[in-house]
Amino acid sequence: MARGDYYSDDGTTDKEMCPRCGDTFLAAHDDRQVCGRCGYTEWE
């Protein structure tokens, strides 16, 4: 999936960004969100 597919027509997105990297989306799993670049993990 292309990065542009995550944005709506008005330029907003519902996906969360990594607080460490800043320009990377967090991958949503069942019990956590993970940054594929630096490994940052948020447990739910």
UniProtKB/Swiss-Prot annotation:
Family as reported in the entry's similarity comment: Belongs to the eukaryotic ribosomal protein eS31 family.
Positions of C4-type zinc fingers: 18-38
Protein name: Small ribosomal subunit protein eS31
Statement: the UniProt record of this protein carries the keyword Zinc: yes
Lineage of the organism: Archaea, Methanobacteriati, Methanobacteriota, Stenosarchaea group, Halobacteria
SMART domains cross-referenced by the UniProt entry: Ribosomal_S27
Cofactor note: Binds 1 zinc ion per subunit.
Keyword Metal-binding attached: yes
Any one of the GO CC terms: ribosome
Amino acids binding Zn(2+): C18, C21, C35, C38
Organism: Halobacterium salinarum (strain ATCC 700922 / JCM 11081 / NRC-1) (Halobacterium halobium)
